């Protein structure tokens, strides 16, 4: 796992806040796993991917679709940014977030464009799955 950014560092999710005041609060501490909505969870999951916080990713993945394990980022992967294209809550317990995540691997830029589905159970949001665009 990579070390989270120090206090003045911007959050990897792209919000204009320091990591501890943004996604860091969902990754550890009193608000651990308590992202208030699907978009916040999506942003916190992106930050967790950037920081190789695999336990957080697994804990925020719905048990019905969760893989048994995740591999850390390859050494040549550099995450470049997240853009939220759309965020929509269908009802109190279902939401979707469309995003584009940019990364560079082996010197080659690529992007992941996904429409992700989220569900809220027992007061917690979970990533369920997504459709690659």
Swiss-Prot record:
Belongs to the UPF0225 family. Gene3D superfamilies: 3.10.450.50. Transmembrane segments: none annotated. InterPro entries: NTF2-like_dom_sf, UPF0225, YchJ-like_M. It comes from the Bacteria. This is UPF0225 protein BPP1723.
């Amino acid at each position: 796992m990579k070390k989270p950014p120090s206090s003045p560092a911007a959050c990897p999710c792209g919000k204009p806040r320091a990591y501890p005041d943004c996604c860091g609060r969902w990754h550890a501490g009193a608000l651990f796993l308590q992202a208030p909505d699907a978009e916040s969870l999506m942003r916190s999951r992106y930050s967790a991917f950037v920081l190789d916080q695999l336990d957080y990713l697994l804990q925020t993945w719905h048990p019905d679709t969760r893989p048994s394990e995740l591999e850390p980022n390859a050494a040549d992967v550099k995450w470049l940014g997240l853009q939220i294209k759309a965020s929509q809550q269908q009802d109190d317990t279902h939401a979707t977030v469309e995003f584009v995540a940019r990364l560079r691997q082996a010197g080659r830029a690529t992007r992941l464009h996904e429409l992700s589905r989220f569900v809220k159970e027992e007061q917690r949001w979970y990533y369920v799955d997504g459709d690659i665009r």
